[in-house]
Amino acid sequence: MERKLHLPAKPERHRRFGSVEAVKGIKPTDKEQMKDIQNTPNDYFFDIDHVGVSNVSHPILIASSLKPFTQTTIGAFSFTTSLARDRKGINMSRLTEQLQRYHEANWTVDFHTLKDFAKDLAGNMEQESASVSVSFPWYFERISPETKLSGLMHADIHMTVSYHENKGFSQTAGITAHATTLCPCSKEISEYSAHNQRGIIKITAHINEQAEMPDDFKAELLAAAETNASAKLHPVLKRPDEKRVTEQAYENPRFVEDVLRLTAADLYEMDWISAFEIECRNEESIHLHDAVARLSFSKC
């Protein structure tokens, strides 16, 4: 038998659960008549280096030297500016307003456009400096070694641009990529086989402002991370491919320290990088813990 309920109208339901009528207030509703608290001048004791918003999710367009060459992905943004000691606060709504303007102009996110964005942000916010950071998944085609079947892999990319009206720009590029590592000790002491696992390589590269950037920094950082591990990861592997990848890992055993140092050597040879930090983490297959190594280096 159908159960019938006798429900009151929706406004009455809302009132029953606590909703009340709007209060007719006395404060102004016109923007020009409202008190502007954050722009109230006074001595607020300290300058602030960075203030703004973070974790702003927004669709972005990126270019890639690996297929797919043009991609729409999701960027997680952070926008900050400096704040002088005589200003109480910033106009935070202007931060996401500017993002929307760039989006409506169909911008492609790269270091050129991020530099424009950071400089515009400082001007719009009437501050001497501004920073913009964005992280996003970057997809690229990976072809299996023997059967030549293709699939999409991804790595996480991070880009930061900071602008100061007197000091100019500073930029960092980063990647988090995955690869296979096979333990040299396990290979050496075992009659057969060796334990292997997935390794996570995180790179942060500080960009040399005097050098020419590569066409696609993402691909260069990916190569530095992947080619110094035991073997690459693949989305599609048939048996001939799996045989080749397994043997390749056995032919190139790597401790976490080895991956770290070999990756550092590649980054050292890249003229567009002035300094870097690397972290390598192995999700150990025969332990419950991870193996980790970190390194930082400045060419200056």
Curated annotation (Swiss-Prot):
This is GTP cyclohydrolase FolE2. Converts GTP to 7,8-dihydroneopterin triphosphate. Its EC number is 3.5.4.16. It comes from Bacillus licheniformis (strain ATCC 14580 / DSM 13 / JCM 2505 / CCUG 7422 / NBRC 12200 / NCIMB 9375 / NCTC 10341 / NRRL NRS-1264 / Gibson 46). Pathway: Cofactor biosynthesis; 7,8-dihydroneopterin triphosphate biosynthesis; 7,8-dihydroneopterin triphosphate from GTP: step 1/1. Pfam families: GCHY-1. InterPro entries: GTP_cyclohydrolase_FolE2 (IPR022838), GTP_cyclohydrolase_FolE2/MptA (IPR003801). GO terms for molecular function: GTP cyclohydrolase I activity. One of its GO terms (biological process) is tetrahydrofolate biosynthetic process. NCBIfam families: PRK13674.1-1. Belongs to the GTP cyclohydrolase IV family. Keywords: Hydrolase. It is an enzyme of class 3 (hydrolase).
